[in-house]
């Protein structure tokens, strides 16, 4: 399950990934971001995926990158801090970080929420 809420004071979109996460879940999550007209054009995302179990293959991340590329047209820039703490989640996240190198999309992997928030607040 993926849930989200935006903190308008900090401009950070807080996202929680919990339980089983599939490719379909990720694509739907990215598509929803495109439809949110009230989000800032400089979007900062903090995703807590520490309790998620990803049912993905590395090749699935190409589809996520393609959907994100389409969504990015709506935003000036997106900063995406992704918090993980399991081996498979970390491996998939680092692979995606290398794959998703786009001019206006910055994705970083963190092991703590505090480090992720510090990065987003420093931008």
What do these predicted ranges mean?
Residues 1-123:
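Amphipathic, Lys/Arg-enriched alpha-helical "gate/interface" segment within cytosolic domains
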């Amino acid at each position: 399950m993926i849930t989200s809420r935006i903190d308008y004071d900090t401009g950070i979109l807080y996202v929680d990934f919990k339980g089983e996460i599939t490719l379909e879940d990720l694509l739907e999550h990215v598509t929803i971001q495109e439809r949110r007209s009230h989000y800032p054009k400089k979007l900062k995302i903090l995703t807590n995926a520490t309790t998620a179990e990803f049912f993905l293959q590395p090749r699935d991340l190409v589809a996520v990158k393609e959907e994100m590329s389409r969504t990015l047209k709506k935003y000036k820039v997106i900063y995406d801090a992704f918090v993980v703490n399991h081996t498979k989640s970390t491996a998939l996240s680092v692979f995606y970080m290398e794959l998703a190198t786009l001019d206006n999309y910055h994705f970083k992997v963190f092991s703590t929420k505090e480090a992720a928030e510090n990065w987003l607040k420093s931008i």
